[in-house]
Amino acid sequence: MTAAPIPFVRDFTPLYGQAERLTPHIRRVLANNPGPFTFAGTGTFLVGDADAVAVIDPGPADDAHLSALLQAVAGQTVTHVLVTHGHADHLPLARPFAEAVGAPVLAHPALSPDQHLADGDRITGDGWTLDVLATPGHAPEHLAFAMREENALFSGDHVMGWSTSVVSPPEGDMDAYIDSLDRVMAAGFDTLWPTHGGPVTDPLPFLKALKGHRLGRDDQVLEALAREPSSARAMVPALYAAVDQRLWPAAAQSLLAHLIRLERRGDVEANGVPSATTVYQLRG
């Protein structure tokens, strides 16, 4: 399958340490933790333009970012601290920030929050409404938050404008990831706000290209195995030749997620327990 190129959004000027107004209802405070997996850093979103606000993805354990967040909400009441998933660039600051402002942490039960969230839950505040959308794949507990007033989705790491998302087994699951892409496409959002990088302002073609990329990667893996049995790690140099080599270990994990998906489908079989070095071959 030849997929349409993904129209990545990489034009982004970072503003660290202060709240940046993005829309009438949304501000962002950017953590100074840039890197190959975080782009310019973790963007913590402040939702609401009145006295009471919600905060999404407080971010990494970083005292400077905590101070910036507290300064950004000074004079306001934080009613909810929401977390998309449990990775180290999203979750660690949730508890310290929540305790500092006297607000509950809300997240998937796997993260042991104060209040459990599930698909379809609704969180209401002063002039804003957030609906919970379960989006497993990047992580099993991944949640996204749909803001009804702007028909926008805070997409966490499920969809990022600057890069594809890592899907790393055993937590990451490619079938679940693709199913979650379908759910987001079906919702018809006007804007996606990833935790890393800028917004996706034309979501449908972007999401279609992301899905096409994943299905195309399935085909590339099958073509590689038609030549000879191989492992995810061994396939990386050919399939990710243009990608920063610092990302190759993560790329191997994403290829493993494709191999596990193809094994479920009955197309391939593993010679051992699934891992990045396990050799796979076409079935039959």
Across the structure, where does each feature detected by a protein language model lie?
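C-terminal regulatory/interaction regions
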Residues: 1-4, 8, 223-284
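Glycine/proline-rich low-complexity segments that form flexible loops, beta-turns, and polyproline
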Residues: 1-12, 25, 113, 138
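Conserved beta-strand hairpin/beta-sheet module of binuclear metal-dependent hydrolase folds
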Residues: 12, 16-74, 144-156, 161
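Short, structured coil segments at secondary-structure junctions
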Residues: 22, 100-101, 188
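Residue-level signal for inorganic ion chemistry
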Residues: 25, 69, 196, 221, ...
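Active-site HxH/HxHxD metal-binding segment of metal-dependent hydrolases
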Residues: 39-40, 58-131, 140, 151
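Metallo-beta-lactamase
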Residues: 52-55, 60-62, 129-220, 224
